[in-house]
Amino acid sequence: MNKQGNQMSFLRTIILVSTFGGLLFGYDTGVLNGALPYMGEPDQLNLNAFTEGLVTSSLLFGAALGAVFGGRMSDFNGRRKNILFLAVIFFISTIGCTFAPNVTVMIISRFVLGIAVGGASVTVPAYLAEMSPVESRGRMVTQNELMIVSGQLLAFVFNAILGTTMGDNSHVWRFMLVIASLPALFLFFGMIRMPESPRWLVSKGRKEDALRVLKKIRDEKRAAAELQEIEFAFKKEDQLEKATFKDLSVPWVRRIVFIGLGIAIVQQITGVNSIMYYGTEILRNSGFQTEAALIGNIANGVISVLATFVGIWLLGRVGRRPMLMTGLIGTTTALLLIGIFSLVLEGSPALPYVVLSLTVTFLAFQQGAISPVTWLMLSEIFPLRLRGLGMGVTVFCLWMVNFAVSFTFPILLAAIGLSTTFFIFVGLGICSVLFVKRFLPETKGLSLEQLEENFRAYDHSGAKKDSGAEVIG
């Protein structure tokens, strides 16, 4: 019993340390919300609308590329080594952003930082999925999502604290940015002591090392059985050539890619990052003063963390499909109400409070259902040999849609107003509900190897009989 307790304790340590990649992901995507006003001052980087957009979006471009190359590097070097490498990039690029003397250095540093963010968005969920036992994989993988939203909340809180206490210091934005160097150091030194993924070790023929790792996080009998299951799955793939983009055109793999791309797009076209990146501007647009809007932005961060706790709890009890459907219906309804009330209550002192309550409601559904399911399913639907490449391609798509939404939102807001902008997202939300209902398989309760078998079986059967809870792929 004591040995089993040590195994669980070590597994929890693995989860805590590796998900600091998610914390960095969240902090670095959220911190600019409060840093930009100070950064843009004439005696600092002197940003205009164009360069401000470049500083913001350069991270997203880098993240898109980091997702693709991070997946391939993860397959080649291993999940653990890749996370160590990403921690170094996080640290160096954070220092580059902090001490940037001009906008050019800032854009380059943000781009490099984005590569680390994108790489972490692929590698950390894959590492967690491959270390977790099947019955708790959902809860453990979505710990990363919890760390992402916690990182965003920390960014909002530190921005508010530093902005309030050091607002008269023109370099306050540099203090906001440099904070991210601390979790980068923790991630690096923590991962040095963590083991490599047993599934990756088997893929490299290191079966004894894989068994040694499994015995550290499973009881001996289960470790041996799980190793056999991994070996059996790998033997089927061992006869195939090394994974390339051409492999993604194989019919049964193509279906997985289609589902993965759909999940990635669905998560972003809800408009979540229009709220996470421009939440303060949305609240100001609805009638709040700047200070009240900043406080409201912290409320958005708090509800994101609380909702993610609920989402992690639900994943162990509810299927992926019903969670995603419920989340999409909730977010689409919240956006519809924002659009309607922005028209009906235009100019009313009640409008900003209504909009704030609805953005909080939106984030409760987004972070409590949609986002946890997204990252979990992307980490579990691809077969071992294609997991790094497959996640890289789908998360590249996720980041590019993220960029498109984040880039166009302020343009739409200025051109057609708050209500019409959100009506567009309502239309996209309806399309997302239809996609999930028609195409999304259920993966709860299945091992990664069983999922692969089901996708292969779907290809041989030629048609899916039922898109409900029982799934053939």
Swiss-Prot record:
It is found in: Cell membrane. It is a multi-pass membrane protein. GO terms for biological process: D-glucose transmembrane transport. PROSITE patterns: MFS, SUGAR_TRANSPORT_2. The keyword Transmembrane helix applies. Keywords: Cell membrane, Membrane, Transmembrane, Transmembrane helix, Transport. Disulfide bonds: none annotated. SUPFAM superfamilies: MFS general substrate transporter. The chain crosses the membrane at residues 14-34, 49-69, 83-103, 111-131, 146-166, 172-192, 256-276, 295-315, 325-345, 350-370, 389-409, 411-431. Pfam families: Sugar_tr. CDD domains: MFS_XylE_like. GO terms for cellular component: membrane; plasma membrane. Pathway: Polyol metabolism; myo-inositol degradation into acetyl-CoA. GO terms for molecular function: D-glucose transmembrane transporter activity. Induction: Negatively regulated by IolR. Induced by inositol. InterPro entries: MFS_dom (IPR020846), MFS_sugar_transport-like (IPR005828), MFS_Sugar_Transporter (IPR050820), MFS_trans_sf (IPR036259), Sugar/inositol_transpt (IPR003663), Sugar_transporter_CS (IPR005829), XylE-like (IPR047984). When iolT is inactivated, inositol uptake is almost abolished even though iolF is active. NCBIfam families: SP (TIGR00879). Belongs to the major facilitator superfamily. Sugar transporter (TC 2.A.1.1) family. Major myo-inositol uptake transporter. PANTHER family: D-XYLOSE-PROTON SYMPORTER-LIKE 2. This is Major myo-inositol transporter IolT. It comes from Bacillus subtilis (strain 168). The gene is iolT.
